[in-house]
Amino acid sequence: MMTFLCTRSGRRASGVECRIAAERAYFRVRGLPVANMIGWWPRLCPVMSLALLWACSVGAGSDCKSVAIETDSRIAEQTQQRHLQALFDKYGQNGSISLEGLFNLLKGVGLDRIRKVMVHHPGNAHNHTHTHDHTHTHVDKLTAHTHPVTTKKGDMDHSVEKSDPVPKAQPDPASGKKSQSDAHHNLYMKMNQESTTALTTPSYVTRSRRTNRSADYDFTQDHASFSPSQPNVTHSNHTHHDEDTPTHQHDDHDEHEHARASLGCQNASTILQTHGMRKEASLSVKDFSFLCPALLMQIDSKSCIVHEDEDEHSDHSHHHKHHHHHHDHQHLQHPHNHTNGRGQRNTPVYIAWLGGFLSITLISLLALVGVVLIPLMNRVCFNFLLSFLVALAVGTLSGDALLHLIPHSQGHHHHGHSEEHAEEEDSLRPVWTGLTALSGVYIMFLIEHFLTLGKMYKDKNQKVQKRVDLTTEVLESEKLPSLEENDVKIEAAETNGGRALAEEEEVMLGAELYNDIDCENKCHSHFHDTVGQSDEQHHHHHDYHHILHHHHSQNHHPHTHTHRHTHSYSQQHFEQAGVATLAWMVIMGDGLHNFSDGLAIGAAFTEGLSSGLSTSVAVFCHELPHELGDFAVLLKAGMSVRQAMLYNLLSALMGYLGMIIGILIGHYAENVATWIFALTAGLFMYVALVDMVPEMLHNDASEAGFSHYGFFLLQNAGILLGFGIMLIIAVFEDRIQLDLGY
């Protein structure tokens, strides 16, 4: 009734009119004259005013005619059941949701992975630079994570350990305005998808006796719940001050020790674990209802979204105001290889130094392998082994360049996600692209090899047919010139200074009469197979036919010598060069090569253990035949075994220098390692495709005593093995880790 009296003609009555109307109504109900009750007015005025204010406040606040509306719990429960049933029909089976179904649900709402969003910041008055250190660990392991944040404002620089933020909208008591820092910029730290703090339903939802809070809630994280033995743990307590907002602390800190809200991007396994549920068990409708607040908190806090600046991916410039609260900051550790504000990497530097020194030492010891292979250097199996090693080097060099170095130089490297919901397809896309490029190289290698084998097969058939025809003609001829007459003609041609071309061509045609065994024994064009043999072992007739065959294969090269002269010239050339000159050539030529290899290995180990291992395997495989070749050259030059080993080891020291420079550049210089990877990829591709592939294609298999088909299979085995090694390292590089236990 009083609410009705407070309005007149649809408008709100004033205070005086409302009091007068209340008095008149009261006395009329009592049946008393209004004029006789004037004396009661001083006593009734305060009571009626309070009653009127109470009626207006119960109504709807500002409008006295408003009516309070209560929530229909029955409808809310029905709606909840309807939505839950829809979710269970889509992601569950037989009234329950499995772990796989929960993963699909998280994927559907965008909580399956961390998403990066490019944010463009317009002109800002102040710069606030964030640089993140991320390190990924295994699934469901709780570790500490440190975010070094450097704040620059005016001339004041301070470094704090920044916790992972939640969007804040705390009202300002003085001005009535909200802070615009996180609401305007939406800057969120990148969190671990696999390791987070404990997540429970906030107690302000379940406890009615909890004190009222402002619009944003602060959750104090407990340090004691984490293991103190975790590495790289940094705890820092700090207070943010504001001019207008008073400092407050939580009185119920003991409640938060057991009910902390997680602000990180959690996977399905972690959500179940933090709610006290087993991963093997299926979720019922009641169980799933407990997870809904946690999922809503993750969606609301946008903890699975990472914002990157369009111009600088690691530096976010924004104007930032800090709220007043005390935090005990705890973070989760990720093994990404991002750099912090000083340009240093989160990968422990001792791993880079240890891996680099071990790799360079092992590669340098390849010079000693030549000592073991000395007895095999003049045998057929040595050429067989070198052919396989050259093919293996081609596979590892090109595989490392296309599957590892180029993807890393473009920033498409693995971040070490070993959790179930990692974007495995997206992270491996550069690997499959590089594998496609490798398949193109291999297809061209096969085509060229098949063309060579086809041409050799055709020439062989034509040669056999021609030999048969010539033999038939010789047998049918009545007058066949004897071998002595041929020798006379040859001597005449020699005395005429090689002018008798017709006679020489006749002798070359006569050489076709020899069978394959005679040709192999007498008409061999290479002089390396007979190094060290005396002149008495060769007949003049054999020597001369060797000259003619070699002369014909060299297209009448003017510098044609006998086998004896060629060998003596080669030996004399090395002897005139001297040991000092040869040593200088080996140290400078091979040393520069080792320096570039060490530079690549050092930079790769600063990127990670798997990266360093991949590059080390590639360098090892191509250095093995290279070192064996250098060792053989030095021995044939007249050096002793000890001298050859010494000079090879001296050239290997350049690898240590390159490794040291590579680690220093890769670990302390920002964004330089990517350029080193690109340069190394170019060097590896050049060595593989320009130096080693031609050696494989033009290798004379008949010299080593093997068929061309056998060499073809051997070289294919080496190339495919090299490709396979690099592919395995590229695919499983996130699982290659070194844990020394401290």
UniProtKB/Swiss-Prot annotation:
It is found in: Cell membrane. It catalyses: Zn(2+)(in) = Zn(2+)(out). Residues 148-182, 191-210, 220-260, 310-342 are annotated as: Disordered. Residues 316-339 have a biased composition (Basic residues). One of its GO terms (cellular component) is membrane raft. GO terms for molecular function: monoatomic cation:bicarbonate symporter activity; zinc ion transmembrane transporter activity. Residues 152-165, 239-260 have a biased composition (Basic and acidic residues). Pfam families: Zip. Belongs to the ZIP transporter (TC 2.A.5) family. Acts as a zinc-influx transporter which plays a role in zinc homeostasis and in the induction of epithelial-to-mesenchymal transition (EMT). PANTHER family: SOLUTE CARRIER FAMILY 39, ZINC TRANSPORTER ZIP6. This is Zinc transporter ZIP6. It comes from Danio rerio. The gene is slc39a6.
